[in-house]
Amino acid sequence: DGFEISAAALNHRVPSYAYKIRHQRQVKQLDRDALYAHDLPAGPLWGMLQNGDDVYYQGRNYPASLYVEQHEQQVCALIGGDNDTPSLLQAASDGVQVLVHEATYTQEVADKVGAFPMHSSAKQTAEFAYQAAIPNLVLTHFSARYNDAQALAPLLAEAKLYYHGQVHLAEDFAQYRLLPSGEFQPLSASDA
């Protein structure tokens, strides 16, 4: 619950889409300083307040509404399929914390192969992510000419020339964590 998914059409030889996935939730946080200041010891009574229940302790009433603050947390990712025009995602980029988008080749290779393949270069994707102020970028859908980590280095280098956020090269089966703060972390096998 709390998920919202929307689609945006992309530009490719066959129908292709990007999906914006947003998760919002209400978070309750105890005002610990106020509870200590009003002499309510930490323990099960705090749990009752956290659950929204008023507490009566040593002749004093502790209304949950005075000690529990609610705020909204959200995470938002935009995941694109085949696309030669990253700017098509402009309208969908509001609030996005991570963009997963193809960078099939470097701009030099893109210029050589021409427009027909209808894929984005690392430069195009990085420029869009920078312009849209998206803090994290995951590049994916690499041409077969980039067949190992060393061969992928020019894609990463090109992206970093045009984008100054966190950049990752997608790997099969890799997992990441996106925190409400916008921090984007690769997970190790033990974290997953």
Where is each model-derived feature located?
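A short helix-to-beta-strand connector/capping loop
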Residues: D1, Q74, Y163-Q166
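A short linear-motif detector with a strong N-terminal bias
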Residues: D1, Y56-G59, A77-G80, P117, ...
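Active-site-proximal loop/helix segment associated with metal-binding centers of metalloenzymes
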Residues: F3-I79, N83-A91, V98-V100
